[in-house]
């Protein structure tokens, strides 16, 4: 199994090759909302466009929390992989999936409960707040997809593969744009359609990462014997 190894060869080029996809990936994750805004602004009017901007601010508060958690998980993955403890790596993956998934569900519920108070705190006009809430209810309902993409990306980063998660994200960006045009421009689903496009695109990124992991790094995916809560 070939992975990046900073202990061999020239270190600076290897650091750049590892860091650049990670940086671009973090930037691209913010572009889901930007793509939605472009399509909404063109096909759903100024109020919906303003709602997307407000929603992006609220959404990022919770996305940064998930991203930070997965960054911490990637450190644990890297420790297990660096010590060649693949059984430990797989069990960490299982525990991260279970407890990270539960944390994400709690975070989703908290986000939904705090949604209206946050929009009020931001002094959002009622017509804009209503549309922003329509968008965010779908986004927060699909927060598990965001978590599992970041978890898969953390697993890939821990073995030195930062490009594959980026490629999956690029494919999801293209799907998001296509689905936005279908749901908003063609089917007239408005701002909720843009949110569904984002969630479905994120699910695609998860599926692509899992397929790649199963094909390239099958020994990293947890098995029945790894499903222990200890």
Q: For the regions a protein language model found, what residue spans apply to each?
A:
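Short alpha-helical transmembrane segments in multi-pass integral membrane proteins
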Residues: 1-19, 77-144, 186-230
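Membrane-helix interface/capping residues of multi-pass secondary transporters
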Residues: 37, 46-49, 86, 115, ...
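Interfacial/gating helices of multi-pass transporter permease domains
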Residues: 40-60, 126-131, 191-192
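Membrane-helix boundary and inter-helical linker elements of multi-pass secondary transporters
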Residues: 42-45, 79, 158, 185-187
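Small-residue-rich hydrophobic transmembrane alpha-helices
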Residues: 49-109, 146-165
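Hydrophobic transmembrane alpha-helices of multi-pass small-molecule transporters
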Residues: 61-64, 108, 176-180, 206-210
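Alpha-helical transmembrane segments of multi-pass membrane transporters/permeases
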Residues: 100, 155-178, 196-199
């Amino acid at each position: 199994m070939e992975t990046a190894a900073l202990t061999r060869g020239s270190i600076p080029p290897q650091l750049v090759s590892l860091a650049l996809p990670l940086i671009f990936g973090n930037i691209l994750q913010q572009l889901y909302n930007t793509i939605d805004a472009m399509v909404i602004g063109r096909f759903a009017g100024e109020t919906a466009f303003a709602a997307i901007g407000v929603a992006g601010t609220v959404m990022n508060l919770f996305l940064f929390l998930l991203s930070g958690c997965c960054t911490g998980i990637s450190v644990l993955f890297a420790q297990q992989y660096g010590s060649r403890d693949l059984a430990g790596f797989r069990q960490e993956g299982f525990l991260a999936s279970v407890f990270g998934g539960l944390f994400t569900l709690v975070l989703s519920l908290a986000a939904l409960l705090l949604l209206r108070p946050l929009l009020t705190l931001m002094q959002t006009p009622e017509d804009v707040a209503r549309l922003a809430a329509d968008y965010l209810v779908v986004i927060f309902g699909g927060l598990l997809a965001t978590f599992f993409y970041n978890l898969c990306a953390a697993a890939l980063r821990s073995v030195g593969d930062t490009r594959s998660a980026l490629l999956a994200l690029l494919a999801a960006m293209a799907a998001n744009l296509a689905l936005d045009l279908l749901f908003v421009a063609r089917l007239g689903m408005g701002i909720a359609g843009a949110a569904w496009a984002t969630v479905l695109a994120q699910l695609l990124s998860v599926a692509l990462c899992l397929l790649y992991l199963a094909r390239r790094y099958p020994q990293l995916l947890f098995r029945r014997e790894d499903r222990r809560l200890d």
